[in-house]
UniProtKB/Swiss-Prot annotation:
Keywords: ATP-binding, GTP-binding, Nucleotide-binding. Belongs to the RapZ-like family. GTP binds at D56, V57, R58, N59. This is Nucleotide-binding protein Shewmr4_0670.
Length: 284
């Protein structure tokens, strides 16, 4: 089992790091008291091999040796990785002033600036025990996400799920599409009597469309467009990308084009799905 502990000063980006871990398949728990880590891992054994928890100043033991004992008494086979996120007092003060959130150590007689300094002092021993120290003072959320992925995966890229969806314009456009392409200008198998009752999944329709230079050129251009911009989309904290392909009825052209694109991107670099909305509705 892999366990990732994320700690750091409030406002330094712990929630961003947890979101990255969640996208990577980790079971995430926010602000779990350290004495409960062992029991949590025992309960998740066999069902979740990736676990991440965040620890802040409110759930730390008062003595450093207690923390060390808790981290060294984890269940056998636990692979531990830890992060400590920090920012300068000036940056943290600015972030809290902008969001107007209450600092965990803020009290009626303690100013925000004093609370920030106190937290830094309390967390200093913990910061010395963490595997990875990240100063987020000059990082935006995307740069921080990249650093966390780089440490865990050895790469800033994460697995992007690409969904190719065919649809018919006469049945309405899909609302969840990131890109939408209209293929109604392509040669239409509907006007071939023997092809009309078939779909873009059937071999005769596929052969008909594959013989059309315009169809092949269009597929190539969409593939080239997506290949060019996919690396940038992956670094923009995306988990899913939906490309909708539409023709008139959603039976022939859009189905074929979506299938061809799905095959071209099923090269092991991404998880690819092909969904045909109107064909699914017909089966239902």
């Amino acid at each position: 089992m892999k366990l990732v502990i994320v700690s750091g000063r409030s406002g330094s980006g712990k929630s961003v790091a947890l979101r990255v871990l969640e996208d990577l398949g980790y079971y995430c728990v926010d602000n779990l008291p350290l004495p409960l880590i062992g029991s949590l891992l025992e309960q998740l054994k066999g069902s979740n091999d990736l676990v991440a928890i965040s620890v802040d100043v409110r759930n730390l033991p008062e003595q450093d040796k207690v923390l060390v004992k808790q981290l060294t008494s984890l269940p056998e086979g636990t692979e531990l990785t830890s992060f400590f996120l920090n920012s300068s007092d000036k940056v943290l003060l600015k972030r809290y002033s902008e969001t107007r959130r209450l600092h965990p150590l803020s009290k009626s007689r303690v100013s925000l600036q004093e609370a920030i300094k106190l937290e830094g002092k309390l967390l200093e021993p913990l910061s010395q025990q963490m595997d990875h120290y990240i100063d987020t003072s000059n990082l935006n959320i995307y740069e921080l996400s990249d650093q966390v992925r780089q440490i865990l995966l050895g790469s800033v890229d994460k697995e992007l799920v690409i969904n190719f969806e065919s649809f018919g314009f006469k049945h309405g456009m899909p609302t969840e599409a990131d890109f939408m392409f209209d293929v109604r200008f392509l040669p239409n198998p509907h006007w071939e009597p023997e092809l009309r009752p078939l779909t873009g999944l059937d071999e005769p329709v596929a052969e008909f469309l594959n013989r059309q230079p315009l169809v092949n050129k269009f597929i190539w251009q969409i593939e080239n467009l997506l290949e060019t911009w996919l690396p940038h989309l992956e670094r923009n904290n995306r988990s899913y990308l939906t490309i909708a392909i539409g023709c008139t009825g959603g039976q022939h052209r859009s189905v074929y084009v979506a299938e061809q694109l799905a095959k071209r991107f099923s090269n092991g670099k991404h998880k690819v799905n092909a969904r045909h909305r109107e064909l699914s509705h017909a089966k239902a």
